[in-house]
């Protein structure tokens, strides 16, 4: 609301509308536990309608578990874990470790307007990282250390923020 948007809570498939802009101008998929979120999306018959809206161009942002749900491929997924997909990337669940391994770091994030004089501070809580991206996926931020998934031309370490068309995903929690 502070940014001028009018948030709408989505609890049921009827809250989604039939097309982008019908009821929603965009979607924020928060952090949480991705397998539980996947189970609930399936139980409440929201998985297919959300997939269709995303495929039709609904802008969406996913943080942490939201990143996992927006990925086309996941390493370490639970058996039967459903994804929304949409971003041509492979993510690794809980890549930075368990809850006790949560940490904070200043990122290399020129794609998010941050630079050496203005780093982007990020909080990682049981976070995924991006193992690889497909063509057309823009890498927006990396950690300062670690292997950048062998992606040529990528400075820094692990990939932690990407954009693919109208979809944006971060492995960190910007709200913290």
Regions found by a protein language model. Give the residues of each.
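Beta-strand->loop->alpha-helix junctions that form or flank phosphate-binding loops
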Residues: 8-14, 140-145, 158-163
């Amino acid at each position: 609301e502070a940014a001028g948007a009018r948030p709408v809570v989505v609890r049921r498939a009827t809250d989604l509308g039939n097309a982008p802009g019908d009821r929603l101008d965009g979607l924020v998929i928060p952090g949480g536990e991705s397998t539980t979120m996947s189970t609930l999306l399936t139980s409440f018959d929201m998985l297919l309608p959300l997939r269709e809206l995303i495929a039709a161009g609904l802008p969406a942002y996913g943080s942490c578990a939201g990143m996992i749900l927006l990925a086309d491929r996941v390493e370490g997924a639970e058996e039967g874990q459903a994804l929304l997909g949409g971003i041509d990337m492979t993510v690794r669940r809980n890549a930075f470790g368990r809850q006790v391994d949560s940490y904070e770091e200043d990122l290399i994030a020129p794609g998010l307007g941050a630079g050496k004089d203005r780093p982007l501070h990020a909080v990682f809580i049981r976070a995924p990282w991006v193992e690889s991206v497909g063509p057309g996926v823009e890498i927006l931020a990396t950690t300062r250390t670690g292997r950048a998934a062998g992606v040529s031309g990528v400075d820094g370490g692990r990939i932690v923020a990407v954009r693919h068309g109208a979809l944006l995903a971060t492995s960190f929690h910007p709200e913290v």
